[in-house]
Swiss-Prot record:
Keywords: Cytoplasm, Schiff base, Thiamine biosynthesis, Transferase
Subcellular locations according to the entry: Cytoplasm
Oligomeric form and interacting partners: Homotetramer. Forms heterodimers with either ThiH or ThiS.
Species in which this protein is naturally found: Pelodictyon phaeoclathratiforme (strain DSM 5477 / BU-1)
Listed EC numbers: 2.8.1.10
GO terms for cellular component: cytoplasm
Pathway recorded for this protein: Cofactor biosynthesis; thiamine diphosphate biosynthesis
Protein name, entry field: Thiazole synthase
Predominant location: cytoplasm
Keyword Cytoplasm set for record: yes
Amino acid sequence: MDALQLGSYTFSSRLILGTGKFSNATVMLEAVRASGAQLITVALRRFNREQAEDDLFGPLSAIEGVTLMPNTSGASTAAEAIRAAHIARELSGSPFIKVEIHPNPQHLMPDPIETLEAARVLASEGFLVMPYITADPVLAKRLEDVGCASVMPLGSAIGSGQGVATAAMIEIIIRESGIPVIVDAGLRSPSEAANAMEMGCSAVLVNSAVAVAGNPPEMAEAFAEAVAAGRKAFRAGLMQKSGSAIATSPLTAFLGAKG
């Protein structure tokens, strides 16, 4: 079985789905089911058992095979992210935490210094830390060294739909990493997800591309199929690129044939 291993957890699906931006909870839940995703990320503010209409914890937990990964979206410092992680673990019981620290709402780029500090503390406390980062190979290695379960470099800015603009740096991270590398943010189409998997990414996280699609459940299914195809292609081994044409059939054998 070609499974995604995160800590002691094993997942057959390599598509991770976010839960923001959907028009309503019903559509979101339909998309989760259609995707077959087993790891679902949820903002801490959506854990609200006292307000059923705002709570996603109960409905998502009821889906068989789903593991929740709370995130610290909204945190602007390591201290805020650590506090959010503690609350999230208490509410959800999940050891996973996606560390998101982006202090500037104009571009939502993750703060590398605060992210590394939060990851160091949370990993030492037994969390399975999944940090959202810029595609920085040096930072990715430092996060691995402090005990993160994976690194999640951005493909492009959150919600931008610009695809994997950081492919060259992500390829370096993949080569040097001893933990799963998961592309997070910026994906617009299933073909981009397939390309990320063909590069050797362990998984992809998708949210906006599914949530704002004309038919979110159908798009979720399309992403699932693309991720599976990309992974299969990576394992099969892609042909090498060439700077010139290479014939697939003999070009000269027939010239010596007698009519």
